[in-house]
Amino acid sequence: FIQANDMRPLADTANFIAVYPQGAIDPEGGTTSWIHKAPTDHDDIFFIEAIINELSTEYDIDQGRIYACGYSEGAIISYELGCRLNSRIAAFAAVSGSMLDDYYRDDIYGWGTCSPVHPTAMMLIPGTVDQNPHSTYEGLSYGDMPLYMSANDITTFWSSYNNTDAVPVITNVEDVSPNDGSTVERKVWLNGDNCSSVQELKVIGGDHDWPGVLGNMDIDATNEIWNFVSRFSIEGKLNCNISVNDFSFDKKQNLNSNTKDKY
């Protein structure tokens, strides 16, 4: 992940701590993929919580501004952190990876349903032609068993939980790279509890990529994510004067921050 998306230069200027964990080693086989088989007692959520606790003893971290993001399987674990470590996660983002359906999470893994405990801002950046089983735009089922949620189901879940406006504000991102074979539609659900919001950057024609590095070049996923999550704490939006323009990244804007956050 760090090879494709090195956030350290941004962390240096925006004053946050970038942490790149590797999935805990599975005692049965030695692999390090995130939550890759079920049923299992091998639970990466406990591992991430232990990392947060350990880093909190070494650094002066704002405990109200701990964020998560990930790509592919890392996106899946980001959703799980939003669901099952929600009391520690202020906001999160997922790129090219889907959210486990509650059937898969509960009946197969035995982790219970997704149960956040506070209004939680979240962003997803899916590609509409992504054919990886765990990240297809339309979701994935095996027979009558739902496994991974569609992008629409994900935004419905989080916008409903956050009690946002039912209808999103939709804008088209400028197609500054017409040769990349894709465009981006920005959908923002505003006015949630504690001024929370949900945002989808729908990459139309996008594949299993991290925009700005591979695939779509109209947006930079790294900057888009930080611009979004950094506006929230565990208690909600830092400034409740919400405008949809708040969520449109401008490369000219100042990303410097006076707080040290874990990301």
Q: What do these predicted regions represent?
A:
Residues 1-67, 71, 80, 84, ...:
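Serine-hydrolase catalytic machinery in alpha/beta-hydrolase-like enzymes
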Residues 90-91, 96-182, 188-195:
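The feature captures the conserved acid-bearing segment of alpha/beta-hydrolase catalytic domains
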Residues 75-86, 96:
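Short glycine-enriched nucleophile-adjacent loop
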Residues 165-168, 236-262:
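Residue-level detector of functionally pivotal "anchor" positions at catalytic/ligand-binding pockets or at interdomain
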Residues 217-239:
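Catalytic active-site module of serine/aspartate enzymes centered on a nucleophile-bearing elbow/loop
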Residues 9-14, 60-62, 69, 73, ...:
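Extracellular/periplasmic catalytic domains that process cell-envelope and extracellular macromolecules
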Residues 22, 69, 95-96, 123-127, ...:
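Alpha/beta-hydrolase-fold catalytic nucleophile elbow
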Residues 205-209:
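Histidine-bearing beta->alpha loop at or near hydrolase active sites
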